[in-house]
Regions:
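Long, ordered, helix-rich scaffold segments
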Residues: 1-195
């Protein structure tokens, strides 16, 4: 019954672990309901919110269920920087070893929130172009506007030059081919005989 019930119906039920887990497993749930479910579940399981979120995100990523990772990620990046710093190693694992793009982006956003800057996360991401793409995609999801603004210079520098260990792709022969080829035929004159 909990799997098929709407979030509004779940909020009317007694607050149990199963109800809170059902709310946190849904996508497109209002943030205030997610916050309440996280706080309630953390209290019932006697865990802190960050470790609970990280275990849920890790389990969802491992099983390939990424539909609600962005919602859980929003809750994670709202957590205090001090609490996120305690889980720094787990955040780095999410950022560098996550299966889904959403998980890796969330990991980078949480690392930047924990550090209060993007320099360490940028250094970690500069190991490959895919990681760098994930880092860039994580920037808009940072909830702290001041931190997001401070990342402007780092993002801007990537517009003109890649980190030294990453080289631009060599131009291939395929880039020298014309982009479009059009064949144009004039209509036949009306006084021509078809043979």
């Amino acid at each position: 019954a909990l799997l098929n019930a709407s979030v509004q119906d779940l909020m009317k039920l007694d607050r149990t672990e199963a109800v809170y887990e059902a709310i946190l497993s849904r996508q497109n749930v209002p943030v205030e309901y997610l916050r309440e479910a996280l706080t309630g579940l953390a209290g019932l399981q006697k865990k802190d919110a960050v470790s609970l979120l990280l275990s849920m995100i890790g389990a969802n990523d491992a099983s390939g269920q990424t539909s609600n990772i962005s919602s859980l990620g929003q809750l994670l990046t709202e957590q205090p920087a001090a609490a996120l710093k305690k889980a720094r190693n787990t955040l780095e694992d999410l950022a560098t070893k996550g299966k889904a793009e959403e998980t890796r982006r969330l990991g980078y956003a949480a690392i930047m929130t924990a550090d209060g800057s993007g320099e360490n996360a940028l250094f970690a991401a500069s190991q490959s172009k895919d990681s760098l793409r994930d880092w860039l995609a994580a920037v808009p999801s940072i909830s702290n506007a001041e931190l997001r603004g401070n990342l402007f210079s780092s993002v801007r520098s990537l517009m003109f030059e890649l980190p030294p260990n990453l080289k631009a792709e060599a131009s291939g022969g395929s880039l020298l081919q014309p982009g479009i080829a059009v064949d144009y035929f004039q209509p036949s004159a009306s006084n021509v005989a078809i043979e």
